[in-house]
Swiss-Prot record:
Keywords: Hydrolase. Belongs to the carbon-nitrogen hydrolase superfamily. Aliphatic amidase family. CDD domains: aliphatic_amidase (cd07565). Disulfide bonds: none annotated. This is Aliphatic amidase. InterPro entries: Aliph_Amidase/BUP, Aliphatic_amidase, C-N_Hydrolase, C-N_Hydrolase_sf. It is an enzyme of class 3 (hydrolase). Pfam families: CN_hydrolase. The active site is at E59, K134, C166. One of its GO terms (molecular function) is amidase activity. The gene is amiE. Catalyzes the hydrolysis of short-chain aliphatic amides to their corresponding organic acids with release of ammonia. SUPFAM superfamilies: Carbon-nitrogen hydrolase. It catalyses: a monocarboxylic acid amide + H2O = a monocarboxylate + NH4(+).
Length: 345
């Protein structure tokens, strides 16, 4: 893991993250103009960072937040589509991989159902090699339709990459899911605003440490007339230490080289903090000393997760018993969310 240079090597993947200024757009034409600005920025960055293999732009950087519902539906994109075609051309021209935001991607039942909040990973040939739909939209504000799975893709130089979006990253489960599928770099694109800056910076570092993985965070910056976005895009090592972090500046860029051999060596040979290995080999030292085998215990000891998998409704009722049983809150209503119990559709 190296920071401070503009290079990369056969063993390192040069990764850049961008504090893209949150755009305020209203029409498809404005969105496509912004796509061209992103594409131009990517090509320019490659000339300044010749080692750059992968660049990450924040959530909402393509379309901004459409606060008008009709504008949201009117500008919802397809994947592939006009927006991704512009990004693909830039990736081909620069010979760079890129992560881009599509907010939103048309639902299969568009326009009867809300769009998805989507990320795409595009390779240096312009091919879309991963499309991820946000599993945990930022309720109660975000009205995106939720996705249902994570992915791992072999990225530049073979580094294994998963994509997650913003509020996804507040749930340890999604990081673990990506890591256990083999992700070595988890990319978190976010359009996070104040007040939760400190918490989001902390979460990314903690999840890198807990999952023995690299983390790349790209966050929006600036003010869009509604929210103030705190930036702090960052690259974090698999030991939880920050390699590089921007401030709050609009269009700030950070860059680091992520060693492929280092993370694979650590996962194979580290012991006391090898969290992925130890989770499925619980207590192996004591089990070995007892003469009960030398691989520890693999069974899941966490009753809540067992219940969630076998009886999701009962797990939901258990959560509601310690929180609330309505999605809305009477003292702080958001939109039309119900504040009284309703029947499931």
């Amino acid at each position: 893991m190296r920071h401070g240079d503009i290079s990369s090597s056969p063993d390192t993947v040069g990764v850049a993250v961008v504090n893209y200024k949150m755009p305020r757009l209203h029409t498809k034409a404005e969105v496509l103009d912004n796509c061209r600005r992103i594409a131009d920025m990517l090509v320019g960055m490659k000339s300044g960072l010749p080692g750059m293999d992968l660049v990450v732009f924040p959530e909402y950087s393509t379309q901004g937040i459409m606060y008008d519902e009709q504008e949201m539906y009117d500008t919802a994109a397809t994947v592939p589509g006009e927006e991704t075609a512009i990004f693909s051309a830039a990736c081909r021209e620069a010979g760079v991989w890129g992560v881009f935001s599509i907010t939103g991607e048309q639902h299969e039942d568009h326009p009867r159902k809300p769009p998805y909040n989507t990320l795409v990973l595009i390779d240096d040939h312009g091919e879309i090699v991963q499309k991820y739909r946000k599993i945990l939209p930022w309720c109660p504000i975000e009205g995106w339709y939720p996705g249902d799975t994570t992915y791992v893709t072999e990225g530049p130089k073979g580094l294994k990459i998963s994509l997650i979006v913003c509020d996804d990253g507040n749930y340890p489960e999604i990081w673990r899911d990506c890591a256990m599928k083999g992700a070595e770099l988890i990319v978190r694109c976010q359009g996070y605003m104040y007040p939760s800056k400190d918490q989001q910076v902390l979460m990314a570092k903690a999840m890198a440490w807990a999952n023995n993985c690299y983390v790349a965070v790209a966050n929006a910056a600036g003010f869009d007339g509604v929210y103030s976005y705190f930036g702090h895009s960052a690259l974090i090592g698999f030991d939880g230490r920050t390699l590089g972090e921007t401030g709050e500046e609009e269009y700030g860029i950070q860059y680091a080289q992520l060693s492929i051999s280092a993370i694979r060596d650590a996962r194979a040979h580290d012991q006391s903090q090898n969290h992925l290995f130890k989770l499925l080999h619980r207590g192996y030292s004591g089990v070995h000393a007892a003469g009960d085998g030398d691989r520890g215990v693999a069974d899941c000891p966490f009753e809540f997760y067992k219940l969630w998998v076998t009886d999701a409704q009962q797990a939901r009722e258990r959560v509601e018993a310690i929180t609330r049983d309505t999605v809305g809150v009477a003292d702080c209503r958001v939109g039309s969310l119900p504040v009284e119990q309703t029947l499931e559709a």
